[in-house]
Amino acid sequence: LREIAFRTAGGGTGKAVDIDEFDTMENGCRQLIVWNPEDEEIIGGYRYLYGRDWRTDKNGQPVLATGHMFRFSQQFMRDYAPYTVELGRSFVSLDYQNVRGNTKSIFALDNLWDGLGALIVINPDCRYFFGKMTMYPSFSKRGRDMILYFLRKHFNDDDKLIVPMQPLEMVTPEEELA
């Protein structure tokens, strides 16, 4: 379902099944599924992995789907990783996306986020969510820059806990975003 949802938007893996080594490895990713019991349909889902289950490589870096994108500081690994959940591969099934113009879509994201809240209730030692998000090249650069500006202004990582290997540069002048 995730592959179908992303392929429709111009993304996806192109494979028949959207499974990788992080799904199949020992103590691999788990799946959060949001279910509509009335229609017996999957609304959406997230792939997740508890920090306490992360494996590390010979350099002390976590073996994660985001591992090729970021460097994780020793402080992060010591003080935050055990209480963090890596999120990825989120999706909303096509029938529950607002672009379809149907009423099924009204609570799809809310239900998905309620599921994330349930992870915290079930596992009270989890305090943080971490993950990446996809923005396709067709997404407005100005729109992307507005998101980057907001995140850097209000949630900047001054301690360099997690550092991107290839940081995104804003193309929109900052004074236009302030």
Protein language model regions, located:
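Short amphipathic alpha-helix that is part of the acyltransferase structural core
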Residues: L1-Y50
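Acyl-donor binding region in acyl/amide transferases
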Residues: G51-A178
